[in-house]
From Swiss-Prot:
Start and end residues of each Era-type G domain: 4-172
InterPro entries hit by this protein: G_ERA_dom (IPR030388), GTP-bd (IPR006073), GTPase_Era-like (IPR005662), KH_dom-like_a/b (IPR015946), KH_dom_type_2 (IPR004044), KH_sf_prok-type (IPR009019), P-loop_NTPase (IPR027417), Small_GTP-bd (IPR005225)
Annotated localization: Cytoplasm; Cell inner membrane
Gene responsible for this protein: era
Family: Belongs to the TRAFAC class TrmE-Era-EngA-EngB-Septin-like GTPase superfamily. Era GTPase family.
Protein name: GTPase Era
Organism: Thermotoga petrophila (strain ATCC BAA-488 / DSM 13995 / JCM 10881 / RKU-1)
Superkingdom of origin: Bacteria
GO molecular-function terms, A-Z: GTP binding; GTPase activity; ribosomal small subunit binding; small ribosomal subunit rRNA binding
Length: 300
């Protein structure tokens, strides 16, 4: 039996709701979500399968003006993800209006020559009139637009209409992945992302953006517990102090929340060993950490 299948890249500036959209479609959390911009750093393939389709959503970092080498890698990974896909889902934030960054993303999307669906998110916040103005501006700047939709990813409104349109536009093809597979990323990547999400939720200002999580070891213990050891890198001693907290209170909270989610993910007990280390200016200079968190691999 033939199915509709293919790759769909999500494009947009930071914090427009790309990861929330994917999690709603998947019916579970596959990618981390935060109200802070630039939460997603890597290109992540999320695999949606039903009885007549398989859609590989390529969730990308938001396209923005980079301030350091980490930012450069993130933007290059996002732009590269638009090449060779079957369809682009270009997402915008209705509440923000149509910004200069949106204009920049629209140009990149248009130059790709790929069929594009536009989804204007946060219509529940901005209202229909403002959302439609954003959608029409975006449509006027992008070649090959097949449809424009107005959605609230957070509330799930309009999301499945977009999903049906994606299925309609995809070609008939093979099932690329087993039907029970939801991402092509390994456990080490998922563990690092879960830890990083808790840091984003619990810390403020520059601390979460200055943080890298590197999984050093994952092993099964004889008692059935999964042991995970992770290093959390920051750029300054003051950031290390914030992450550890008074009498270790913050790192304990991060560890507890991450461990609980990891146990749900793997279906058994987890021992999570977190260590905070300082690597000055790692986002600009430390190629080893950039390699470890996967960004250099994403743009080869």
């Amino acid at each position: 039996m033939s199915i509709k299948s293919g790759f769909v890249a999500l494009a947009g500036k930071p914090n427009v709701g790309k990861s929330t959209f994917i999690n709603v479609v998947m019916g579970r959390k596959v990618v981390i979500v935060s109200d802070k911009p630039q939460t997603t750093r890597n290109r992540i393939n999320c695999i949606y399968t039903d009885r007549d389709s398989q859609i590989i959503f390529v969730d990308t970092p938001g396209i923005h003006k980079p301030l350091h080498r980490l930012g450069e890698y993130m933007v290059k990974a996002a732009v590269q993800a638009l090449k060779g896909v079957d369809l682009i889902l270009f997402m915008l934030d209705a509440a923000d209006g149509f910004t200069k960054t949106d204009e920049h993303v629209a140009k990149i999307v248009s130059e790709s020559g790929t069929k594009t669906i536009i989804a204007v998110n946060k219509i529940d916040v901005a209202g229909e009139e403002k959302a439609k103005a954003v959608g029409q501006l975006a449509k006027s700047m992008v070649e090959n637009v097949v449809s424009v939709h107005y959605i609230s990813a957070l509330k799930g409104e309009g999301v499945f209409e977009v999903l049906e349109k994606i299925k309609e536009e995809l070609p008939e093809g093979p099932q690329y992945y087993p039907e029970d597979m939801v991402t092509d990323r390994p456990l080490s990547f998922m563990a690092a992302e879960i830890i990083r999400e808790k840091i984003f939720h619990l810390t403020r200002q520059e601390v979460p953006h200055s943080t890298a999580v590197v999984i050093e070891e994952i092993k099964d213990r004889p008692n059935g517990v999964l042991y995970i050891r992770a290093n959390i890198y920051v750029e300054r001693d003051s950031q290390k102090g914030i992450l550890i907290g008074k009498n270790g209170s913050m790192i304990k909270k991060i560890g507890t929340l991450a461990r609980e989610e990891l146990e749900f993910l793997v279906g058994r007990k987890v021992y999570l060993d977190l260590n905070v280390k300082v690597k000055e200016n790692w986002r600009e200079k430390d190629f080893i950490i950039l390699q470890e968190i996967g960004l250099k691999d994403d743009i080869k």
